[in-house]
C-alpha cells in the first residue's frame, strides 16, 4: 500500500474542514445549504459562495490524486456542487411565471425570491415581505453556472432548462436600469424597503452576461441548440453605468465593501485598472477596521444601538451608528484571493495573518470564520469617540458559511493546490488587460443600381444590395424581431426576449440563420421609427459616434462589420446626385480614419473571414417553434403601423423563386411598415387659397381659444422670463375643446360649410388637391383630425380605408423628403410618434445619476423622472408635462436622445449636474437663438422648431459646454414649401474665461481670506468652464441680448470705468445656462453638508434645507446631493438660482472656520437681496441712473446678473459683504467685517 503524500494529507485535512463546516448543512434531497442549524432557509447568494470551497476542493483532489479513492472523492465533491446548483435551478424554475413577468415589468413584485425552503425548494416568505429583487444573486448563479460548466461539470440536462437559462439572461440584461435591494437585501440604507440602483448588481450582471455568452450549457456533449446568446449592447450598458457609478455603491451608500466582489474575484467586472485601485483604496480607508471591513458607512446591523423590535431605521437615527458599525471578516478573504490573482504576495501575507488572528477555534481545533464582530454594549461611547480602539466580540452565525467557504478557497489557492485559472476557466481575471486596437470594417451598399452609378461618377466604387447575394441585408429592426423568438418555450410558457432596440454592437456582427449569412444595417439609418434618420447630416454624425463607440467597446473576437446603406433619401432634392455630407463621409472612410476611429472600407465579401459570426439556430426548420405564431408576445413592435417601410422588401424576391418560412416572415415584417400613396400631388399654380401655414394656423387657433377663455397667452412659451408662461397652454390638441368654441374658430377661418353651417369635411378633403404646400395639406388634415378623429375614412379619390392617420403618415414621409423640420415635428406630434430608444435613452441618463425633469417649472407642471419607466408611460408623461403642446412633446423626446448620446460619449459635459431640466433647456435654446439672431422670442421659437436634428444637437452641445456659437441664415430652395428661412449652427472659435478674469478670481480669494482670517480659498467659487468669446462676431450679436439692459458705463470712486457694452450679456447668459442645466461648482454638495452641520438649516425661496439631513446622509452620497438639488429646483428662474448657488458657496467658506456653530436658519435669499442692494447703492453713488433696470420677478438688477464673479464690482464681492453683515453677530470678533 502506497504511503499518503504530504499534499494528500493536507487535502484530507481540508476535506474534513469542508465536511464539518459546510457540507453538514447540505440537504440530502435538494442539495441546498441551510444558513445554520437554527436558520433552515437557503439564500441563493450564500449558497453559491458557500459551495465554492467544495468546487475548489474537488478540482484540487482531481489534480493531486494519489490513488483511486482521491478520484472518487473528487467526483463526490463535484456532484455535491452539481446537486446544489440544480437545487437552486429547481427553486427558480418553480417561479418561471415570475421570470416571464419580470422581463416586461421589472417590478419588485415580479422578481425571483432571494431565499427558499431548504427541504422543499418552495418559497418561505411572501413577495412583499422581503427584499427579494437581488439582481446580483441571480447573476452570481449564472456566472458560476458558466464557470463550472467550463470547468467540466454538467449542470444543465435538457433543452427546456437551456430555454429557462436563456430567459434568466433576459431577466438580468436590464440590470443597468433596475433598482433592487442589493447584496445586503436592504435597498436604501434606511432599510425602509426602498430599492436603488446598486453597482454590485450591475457589475455582477455584466460579468454573468459576458461569461455565459456563446457558452454551450451541455459542455462537450452539446450542439448549437444548447448555446446561450447575449446581446453585446446590454453588456456595454452595464459597463458604462458601472464606470459612472464607481467608487460609489448606490445613491445612499458612498462606498460598500461588497464592491470587492465585482472589482476582483469572482466578477472581475471593471476594465479600468485605475478605477479598480481607487475603489479598493476607498474601501480600505473608509471601511476597514481591526476585525474586517464594515459593509458600508452607518450600517446599523447588529450594533448595540439597533432596535431589535423593528427592521427599518428612522432617517435621523443613522448617525447613531457612525463609528460603531460591525466589522465582517469575510471581506479579508476577498483581499487574500485578490492578492493571489494579482500576484501581490505582501497583500496575501498581510491579510492572512490578520485573518488568522480573528478566527474562532472550534471543536478539534478547526478554524471557524464568524459572521461579524460587534462593539460590546458598554463600550459604545468609547468606540464612538476613539474609533478602532475597543476590543470587539464575535456575533451572528458561526461559522458564517459564505466567509468559511472563501477562507478555505483562499487557503487552497495560497498553498498551490489550485491555480487561479482553475476557478476562473473563462479568464475573467484578464478584464483589465490592455486590449488591441479595434479596426472597424465598413461596407457601403447602394440601395439600387442608379445610386451605384451616381457614386461611380464620383470615383466611389461600391456594390449594390443585389450584387452581394447570397448574403442577405436587412434593417436592424428585423434583428429585434428575430431575437424576440430566442428563448421561447411553450412547455414553460416563456415568450422569449421582449422586443427591444438592438444597438450597433449587435448589428456589427454577421449572423448565420438557416445556413444563410445575414448582415443588418444599424438602427440609426432606419427611417421607420423617428425623424432623426431623415436628416443626412445627422446620419453622418451618428455614424461618426457609432464608429468611435465600436472602437472603444468591441470585445469580441474578429472585427466589427458595419453595413452602411446609401438610399434614395440620401440624394439631393432632385435625385440627381449624392448628398454632399454623405459623399464627403465616404471619402473620409476611404482614408482609413473617421472621427478618431480606425476603419477599413471594402466589399462585404472581403470581410467574411475576419468578421464575428453568431449562429441563430433557434430559427432552424427543425425547431419546435414556428415563426408565425399568434402567441408571439415578444415580437410585437411598438411602431408596427409606421409609414416608412424597409428599403429592402423586394431584394430577395428578385433572386429566389421559392421562399421558405424565414423569407415569408421577414417580408411580412417589412410589409407591415409599407404604406401606399394616397395624397394628391401639390398644386403648382400659386393662386389664393383658403389654407394657411401650419404654424400660423396653430397660433391663430390658440389665440382664438385663449381669447374665448378670457386669457392672454403668448405664442413663444420658450422665451424668458418664465413668469410669462401660462399654465393654460394647450396649443395643438383641440380634441377636448368645447364644440361651440371650435365652431366659432372654424367660422372665422372661412372653411367650406355645409347646409347646416358646419364645416363640410368632404369638401375639405377635396381641397387637398388644390394645396400648393405641404403645410396647407397639413392644416386641412389637422382640422379633420380635430373634427373627425384620426380613424375617420376620408374616401379620398373614391378609395375606402384611407384614414386621416394614413394621410398624416404619408405627409410625414413627404415632409421628411423635403427636410421641413417644423412640419415633421408637428406631424410627429399628431401621430404620437415616439423615439424607439426613448426609454433606453432615459434609462442611460438615470443610470449615470442624472435625474430628468420634463415640462417647465414649477411643479406640478414640471414632472420629475427619477426611475426608469416603461416606454408608453414615459411618452404619456412627456405629453402631459408639455401641456398637450405636441411640438414641445416631440422636441423633448429628441433632446432626451441627444443628452443620452452625449452622456455616453462625453460624460465630462455633465460634471456636477444631477438633474437635467428639459423644459428649461428648450427655453434657453430658444433664448440663445433670439440673442444670436437678434429677433423676437416668437421668431426664435419658430426657428428652433425648424432646426434640422443635426443643428438641434449642435445647439444643445453649445448650451451644455457654454461655448459661443454662430447662426447662419440660408434661404431654402425655391421649390420648398417651408415658411421660414433655414438656419444652421456653427462654432465660433475657442472660448473661455480670460486670463484677467481668472486672475480676478484668484485676487478675490486672497481678499476674502484677509476679510475672514480663517476662510479657506482652496476651491474656486464659480466653475470656470468655456464661456462667451470676445470676437467681433460675439460683440455684434451681444449688442441686444433680449433680457439684458442696454449698454452703459459707470465709474467707481477711483475714476475707473466699467465697460458694459463690450462684453454685455456674457455673465447673464452664463448664469442662465448654468442655472438651466443645474451645473454647480465642484465639491458644492460636500460643502453644503459641512455648513449644515454648523447651522439649523438653509432657507431657499421659502423652503428650508434642515441640518437634520446630515444625520441621515453622508457628504458623498448622491442621495444628499439630490436632496439639495430638489430644494434649489424650487427656484424657477435659472439665473436667480445660480446667484443663490454663488451665495451658498460664499457661505460654505464658514465651514472651514473653527466656529462650532453659526446658530439658526440662514436665509440665502436675504443674502442675495442684500448683495443686490449693496451693488445698487454703489452704482447710484458713482453716478449711475437710479432707475437701473430690475428683474420684475426677483427684484435683482440686470447689471448684477451680468457681473463677473470677481473684481471690484463682482458678485462675490457683494455676496461676501452681505454674508458678513447677515452673520456679523454670530461670527467671532476677529471674523468678517463689512468693508
Swiss-Prot record:
GO MF terms, alphabetically ordered: calmodulin binding
Compartment annotation: Cell membrane
Regulation affecting activity: By phosphorylation of various serine residues and by calcium.
Spans traversing the lipid bilayer: none
Quaternary organization: Hexadecamer of 4 heterotetramers, each composed of alpha, beta, gamma, and delta subunits. Alpha (PHKA1 or PHKA2) and beta (PHKB) are regulatory subunits, gamma (PHKG1 or PHKG2) is the catalytic subunit, and delta is calmodulin.
Region (Calmodulin-binding): 808-838, 1059-1099
A Pfam family recorded for this sequence: Glyco_hydro_15
Gene Ontology BP, a term: glycogen metabolic process
PTM section of the record: Although the final Cys may be farnesylated, the terminal tripeptide is probably not removed, and the C-terminus is not methylated.
Domain of life: Eukaryota
Role: Phosphorylase b kinase catalyzes the phosphorylation of serine in certain substrates, including troponin I. The alpha chain may bind calmodulin.
Tissue and organ expression note: Predominantly expressed in liver and other non-muscle tissues.
Protein name: Phosphorylase b kinase regulatory subunit alpha, liver isoform
The keyword Glycosyltransferase is annotated on this UniProt entry: no
Annotated spans, Disordered: 976-1002, 1032-1060
This protein's record includes keyword Lipoprotein: yes
Biased composition (Low complexity): 976-986, 1032-1053
Family per record: Belongs to the phosphorylase b kinase regulatory chain family.
Residues anchoring lipid (S-farnesyl cysteine): 1232
Modified residues (Phosphoserine): 697, 731, 737, 984, 1016, 1044
Record membrane topology: Lipid-anchor
Pathway involvement of the protein, from the record: Glycan biosynthesis; glycogen metabolism
Amino acid at each position: 500500500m502506497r504511503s499518503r503524500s504530504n499534499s494528500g494529507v493536507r487535502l484530507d485535512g481540508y476535506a474534513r474542514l469542508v465536511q464539518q463546516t459546510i457540507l453538514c448543512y447540505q440537504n440530502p434531497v435538494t442539495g441546498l445549504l441551510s444558513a445554520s442549524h437554527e436558520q433552515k432557509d437557503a439564500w441563493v447568494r450564500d449558497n453559491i459562495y458557500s459551495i465554492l470551497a467544495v468546487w475548489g476542493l474537488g478540482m484540487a483532489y482531481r489534480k493531486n490524486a494519489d490513488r483511486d479513492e482521491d478520484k472518487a472523492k473528487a467526483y463526490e465533491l463535484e456532484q455535491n456542487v452539481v446537486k446544489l446548483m440544480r437545487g437552486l435551478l429547481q427553486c427558480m424554475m418553480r417561479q418561471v411565471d415570475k421570470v416571464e413577468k419580470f422581463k416586461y415589468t421589472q417590478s419588485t413584485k415580479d422578481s425571483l425570491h432571494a431565499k427558499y425552503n431548504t427541504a422543499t425548494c418552495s418559497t418561505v416568505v411572501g413577495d412583499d415581505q422581503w427584499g427579494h429583487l437581488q439582481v446580483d444573486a441571480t447573476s452570481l448563479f449564472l456566472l458560476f453556472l458558466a464557470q463550472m460548466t467550463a470547468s467540466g461539470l454538467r449542470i444543465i440536462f435538457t433543452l427546456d432548462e437551456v430555454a429557462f437559462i436563456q430567459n434568466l439572461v433576459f431577466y438580468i440584461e436590464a440590470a443597468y436600469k433596475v433598482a433592487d435591494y442589493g447584496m445586503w437585501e436592504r435597498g436604501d440604507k434606511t432599510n425602509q424597503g426602498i430599492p436603488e440602483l446598486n453597482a454590485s448588481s450591475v457589475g455582477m450582471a455584466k460579468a454573468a452576461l459576458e461569461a455565459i455568452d456563446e457558452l454551450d450549457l451541455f459542455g462537450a456533449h452539446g450542439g448549437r441548440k444548447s448555446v446561450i446568446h447575449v446581446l453585446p449592447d446590454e453588456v456595454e450598458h452595464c459597463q458604462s453605468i458601472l464606470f459612472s457609478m464607481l467608487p460609489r455603491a448606490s445613491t445612499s451608500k458612498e462606498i460598500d465593501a461588497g464592491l470587492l466582489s465585482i472589482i476582483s474575484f469572482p466578477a472581475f467586472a471593471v476594465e479600468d485598472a485605475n478605477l479598480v485601485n481607487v475603489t479598493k483604496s476607498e474601501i480600505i480607508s473608509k471601511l476597514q477596521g481591526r476585525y474586517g471591513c464594515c459593509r458600508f458607512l452607518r450600517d446599523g446591523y447588529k450594533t448595540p444601538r439597533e432596535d431589535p423590535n423593528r427592521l427599518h431605521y428612522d432617517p435621523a437615527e443613522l448617525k447613531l451608528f457612525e463609528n460603531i458599525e460591525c466589522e465582517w471578516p469575510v471581506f479579508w478573504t476577498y483581499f487574500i484571493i485578490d492578492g493571489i490573482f494579482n500576484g501581490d504576495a505582501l497583500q496575501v501575507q498581510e491579510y492572512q495573518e490578520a485573518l488568522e488572528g480573528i478566527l474562532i477555534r472550534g471543536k478539534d481545533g478547526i478554524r471557524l470564520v464568524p459572521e461579524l464582530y460587534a462593539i460590546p454594549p458598554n463600550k459604545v461611547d468609547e468606540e464612538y469617540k476613539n474609533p478602532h480602539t475597543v476590543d470587539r466580540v464575535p456575533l451572528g452565525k458561526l461559522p458564517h458559511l459564505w466567509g468559511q467557504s472563501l477562507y478555505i478557497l483562499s487557503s487552497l489557492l495560497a498553498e498551490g493546490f489550485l491555480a487561479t485559472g482553475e476557478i476562473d476557466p473563462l479568464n475573467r481575471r484578464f478584464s483589465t488587460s490592455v486590449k488591441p486596437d479595434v479596426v472597424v470594417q465598413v461596407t457601403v451598399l447602394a440601395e439600387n443600381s442608379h445610386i451605384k452609378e451616381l457614386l461611380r461618377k464620383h470615383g466611389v466604387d461600391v456594390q449594390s444590395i443585389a450584387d452581394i447575394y447570397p448574403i442577405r441585408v436587412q434593417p436592424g429592426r428585423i434583428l429585434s424581431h428575430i431575437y424576440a423568438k430566442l428563448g421561447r418555450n411553450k412547455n414553460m410558457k416563456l415568450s422569449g426576449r421582449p422586443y427591444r432596440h438592438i444597438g450597433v454592437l449587435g448589428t456589427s456582427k454577421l449572423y448565420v440563420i438557416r445556413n444563410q449569412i445575414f448582415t443588418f444595417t444599424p438602427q440609426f439609418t432606419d427611417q421607420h421609427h423617428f425623424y432623426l434618420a431623415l436628416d443626412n447630416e445627422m446620419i453622418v454624425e451618428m455614424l461618426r459616434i457609432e464608429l468611435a463607440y465600436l472602437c472603444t467597446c468591441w470585445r469580441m473576437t474578429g472585427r466589427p462589420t458595419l453595413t452602411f446603406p446609401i438610399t434614395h433619401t440620401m440624394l439631393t432634392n432632385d435625385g440627381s446626385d449624392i448628398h454632399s455630407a454623405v459623399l464627403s463621409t465616404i471619402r473620409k472612410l476611404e482614408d482609413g480614419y473617421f472621427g478618431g476611429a480606425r476603419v477599413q472600407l471594402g466589399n462585404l465579401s472581403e470581410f467574411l473571414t475576419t468578421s464575428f459570426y453568431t449562429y441563430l439556430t433557434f430559427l432552424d426548420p427543425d425547431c419546435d417553434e414556428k415563426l408565425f405564431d399568434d402567441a408571439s408576445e415578444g415580437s410585437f413592435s411598438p411602431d408596427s403601423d409606421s409609414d416608412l417601410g424597409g428599403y429592402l422588401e423586394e431584394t430577395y424576391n428578385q433572386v429566389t423563386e421559392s421562399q421558405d418560412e424565414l423569407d415569408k416572415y421577414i417580408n411580412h415584417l417589412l410589409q407591415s411598415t409599407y404604406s401606399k400613396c394616397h395624397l394628391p400631388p401639390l398644386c403648382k399654380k400659386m393662386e389664393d387659397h383658403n389654407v394657411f401655414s401650419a404654424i400660423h394656423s396653430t397660433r391663430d387657433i390658440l389665440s382664438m381659444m385663449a381669447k374665448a377663455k378670457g386669457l392672454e397667452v403668448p405664442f413663444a412659451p420658450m422665451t424668458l422670463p418664465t413668469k410669462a408662461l401660462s399654465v393654460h397652454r394647450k396649443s395643438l390638441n383641440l380634441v377636448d375643446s368645447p364644440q361651440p368654441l371650435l365652431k366659432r374658430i372654424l367660422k372665422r377661418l372661412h372653411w367650406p360649410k355645409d347646409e347646416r353651417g358646419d364645416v363640410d369635411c368632404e369638401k375639405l378633403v377635396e381641397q387637398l388637391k388644390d394645396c400648393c404646400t405641404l403645410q396647407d395639406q397639413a392644416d386641412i388634415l389637422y382640422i379633420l383630425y380635430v373634427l373627425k378623429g384620426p380613424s375617420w375614412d376620408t374616401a379620398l379619390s373614391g378609395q375606402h380605408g384611407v384614414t386621416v392617420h394614413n394621410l398624416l403618415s404619408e405627409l410625414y414621409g413627404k415632409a421628411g423628403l423635403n427636410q421641413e423640420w417644423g412640419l415633421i415635428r408637428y406631424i410627429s406630434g399628431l401621430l404620437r410618434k415616439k423615439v424607439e430608444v426613448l426609454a433606453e435613452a432615459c434609462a442611460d441618463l438615470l443610470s449615470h445619476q442624472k435625474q430628468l425633469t420634463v415640462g417647465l417649472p414649477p411643479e406640478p407642471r414640471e414632472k420629475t423622472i427619477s426611475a426608469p419607466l416603461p416606454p408608453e408611460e414615459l411618452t404619456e408623461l412627456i405629453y402631459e408635462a408639455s401641456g398637450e403642446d405636441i411640438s414641445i412633446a416631440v422636441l423633448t423626446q429628441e433632446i432626451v436622445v441627444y443628452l443620452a448620446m452625449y452622456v455616453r460619449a462625453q460624460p465630462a459635459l455633465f460634471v456636477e449636474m444631477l438633474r437635467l431640466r428639459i423644459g428649461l433647456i428648450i427655453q434657453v435654446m430658444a433664448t440663445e437663438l433670439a440673442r444670436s439672431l437678434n429677433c423676437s422670442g416668437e421668431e426664435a421659437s419658430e426657428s428652433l422648431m425648424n432646426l434640422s436634428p443635426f443643428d438641434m444637437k449642435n445647439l444643445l452641445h453649445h448650451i451644455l459646454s457654454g461655448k459661443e456659437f454662430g447662426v447662419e441664415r440660408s434661404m431654402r430652395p425655391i421649390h420648398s414649401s417651408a415658411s421660414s428661412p433655414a438656419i444652421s449652427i456653427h462654432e465660433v472659435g475657442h472660448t473661455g474665461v480670460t486670463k484677467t478674469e481668472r486672475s480676478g478670481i484668484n485676487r478675490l480669494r486672497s481678499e476674502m481670506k484677509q476679510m475672514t482670517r480663517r476662510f479657506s480659498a482652496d476651491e474656486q467659487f464659480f466653475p470656470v468652464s468655456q464661456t462667451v468669446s470676445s470676437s467681433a462676431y460675439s460683440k455684434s450679436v451681444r449688442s441686444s441680448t433680449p433680457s439684458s439692459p442696454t449698454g452703459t458705463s459707470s465709474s467707481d470712486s477711483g475714476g475707473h470705468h466699467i465697460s458694459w457694452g463690450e462684453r454685455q450679456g456674457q455673465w447673464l447668459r452664463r448664469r442662465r445656462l448654468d442655472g438651466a442645466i443645474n451645473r454647480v461648482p465642484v465639491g458644492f454638495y460636500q460643502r453644503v453638508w459641512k455648513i449644515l452641520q454648523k447651522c439649523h438649516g438653509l432657507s431657499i425661496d421659502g423652503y428650508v434645507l434642515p441640518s437634520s439631513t446630515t444625520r441621515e446622509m453622508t457628504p458623498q452620497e448622491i442621495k444628499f446631493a439630490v436632496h439639495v438639488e430638489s430644494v434649489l429646483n424650487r427656484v424657477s428662474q435659472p439665473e436667480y438660482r445660480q446667484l443663490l448657488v454663488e451665495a451658498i458657496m460664499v457661505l460654505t467658506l464658514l465651514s472651514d472656520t473653527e466656529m462650532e456653530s453659526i446658530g439658526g436658519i440662514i436665509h440665502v435669499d436675504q443674502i442675495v437681496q442684500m448683495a443686490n442692494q449693496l451693488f445698487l447703492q454703489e452704482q447710484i453713488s458713482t453716478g449711475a441712473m437710479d432707475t437701473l433696470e430690475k428683474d420684475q420677478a426677483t427684484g435683482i438688477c440686470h447689471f448684477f446678473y451680468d457681473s463677473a464673479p470677481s473684481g471690484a464690482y463682482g458678485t462675490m464681492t457683494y455676496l461676501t459683504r452681505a454674508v458678513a453683515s447677515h452673520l456679523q453677530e454670530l461670527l467671532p470678533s476677529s471674523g468678517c467685517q463689512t468693508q
